[in-house]
């Protein structure tokens, strides 16, 4: 049986700041050696050369090492997933997941939050965006489900991943071995890596059948409703965090999910919060959350047809500001308006993650019992 989970959201006061994690440990809210995952937003450009993710990663791992007893190698294995880019009102923050000692667990037989982690086999540059990647990711997702004690895919509400994208160095490496890569555009490879990973999640959870190489980035009707995929230069494997609910684990927290049909779909966010177990009025307001919402996690994407609700926009044609940053800022504002809190996890590049032009939403709530 997996252990119950404590989950807290903390602000980042600067890109290298992990003081709020240290404070949680010092105050006895959680133990350094029991931290099993961190998911957060940093204030970089969100692109290939966004090194704020590496800086924040180092800061958090240094606190875990200094405050706990795990070896550097053990701390290095803790999944810490940073999504770069806090465009608009989105505020840099981290959501920290830690297991709870049995003697401190709130007992209940109701479904409660459970977390499982896994790492895939090495993803070679020639794998990215192809069925080799999908197969390796799917296997790792199943490992993470087992780690979370989840047997029914319906109990999985959020799968956060971090995978490698392509760089000039890895493209050259593939070519030196006589291999080809899906694209030589490094920024485009971010969307590609995320999309291929999402299809792997969808396969693992039975949402779709195994796709072909040709389906990747093209057959947008193939998607996962719970995938949240990020990519970067920090690793060469798929780092998987599966978050769901299980009976018997105990604890105060529960997760739910839904999808946004488009960037303005506030109802999709509220549906995820309801699915997590909060009772809300027919037309809810942020005041109705009453401090029980821990965080929401969203992916977003500019619709390939260049419209929202029949109105055209210029995001995909804008040469000054990439559409990644524009849609993230838009959805970040919509989400913050719902939650009343700009510290929300909104990540861009949602190919095969939720419906075309929309994206998946997960919500974690504190039920207090």
Swiss-Prot record:
Organism expressing this protein natively: Rhodococcus erythropolis (Arthrobacter picolinophilus)
Name of the protein described by the UniProt record: Barbiturase
Assembly and interaction partners: Homotetramer.
EC number, UniProt record: 3.5.2.1
Keyword Metal-binding attached: yes
Region (RU B): 112-247
Sequence segments annotated as region (RU C): 253-369
Gene it is expressed from: bar
Active-site feature positions: 162, 230 (nucleophile)
Coiled-coil stretches noted in the UniProt entry, renumbered to this chain: none
Keywords: Hydrolase, Magnesium, Metal-binding
Classification lineage: Bacteria, Bacillati, Actinomycetota, Actinomycetes, Mycobacteriales
Function: Responsible for the hydrolysis of barbituric acid (2,4,6-trihydroxy-1,3-pyrimidine), an intermediate in the oxidative catabolism of pyrimidines. Catalyzes the hydrolytic opening of the pyrimidine ring of barbituric acid to yield ureidomalonic acid.
Annotated Pfam families: Amido_AtzD_TrzD (PF09663)
Binding of substrate, residues: 53, 83-84, 194, 230-231, 328, 347-348
Feature type site, description Important for substrate specificity: 324
């Amino acid at each position: 049986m997996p252990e119950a989970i404590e989950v807290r959201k903390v602000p980042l006061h600067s890109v290298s700041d992990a003081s709020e994690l240290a404070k949680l440990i010092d105050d006895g809210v959680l133990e350094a050696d029991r931290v099993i995952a961190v998911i957060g937003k940093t204030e970089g450009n969100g692109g290939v050369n966004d090194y704020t993710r590496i800086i924040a990663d180092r800061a958090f791992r240094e606190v875990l090492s200094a405050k706990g007893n795990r070896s550097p190698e053990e701390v290095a294995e803790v999944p810490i997933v940073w999504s770069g880019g806090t465009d608009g009102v989105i505020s840099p923050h981290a959501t920290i997941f830690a297991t709870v000692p049995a003697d401190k667990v709130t007992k209940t037989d109701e479904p409660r939050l459970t977390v499982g982690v896994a790492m895939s086999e090495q993803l070679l540059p020639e794998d990215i965006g192809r069925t080799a990647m999908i197969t390796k990711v799917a296997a790792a997702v199943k490992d993470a489900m087992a780690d979370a004690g989840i047997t029914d895919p319906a109990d999985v509400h959020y799968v956060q991943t971090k995978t490698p994208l392509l760089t000039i160095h890895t493209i050259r490496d593939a070519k030196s071995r006589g291999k080809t890569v899906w694209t030589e555009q490094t920024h485009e490879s971010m969307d590609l890596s995320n999309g291929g990973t999402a299809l792997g999640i969808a396969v693992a959870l039975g949402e779709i059948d195994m796709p072909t190489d040709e389906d990747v980035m093209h057959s947008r009707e193939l998607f996962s409703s719970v995938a949240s995929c990020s990519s970067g230069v920090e690793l060469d494997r798929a780092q998987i965090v599966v978050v769901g609910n299980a009976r018997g684990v105990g604890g105060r927290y529960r997760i739910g999910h839904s999808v946004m049909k488009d960037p303005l779909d506030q109802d999709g966010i509220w549906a995820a919060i309801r699915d997590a177990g909060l009772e809300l009025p027919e037309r809810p307001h942020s005041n109705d959350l009453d401090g029980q919402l821990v965080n929401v996690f969203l992916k977003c994407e500019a619709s390939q047809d260049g419209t929202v609700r029949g109105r055209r926009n210029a995001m995909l044609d804008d040469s000054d500001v990439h559409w990644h940053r524009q849609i993230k800022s838009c959805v970040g504002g919509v989400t913050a308006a719902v939650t009343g809190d700009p510290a929300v996890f909104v990540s861009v590049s949602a190919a095969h993650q939720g419906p075309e032009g929309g994206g998946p939403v997960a919500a974690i709530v504190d039920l207090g019992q």
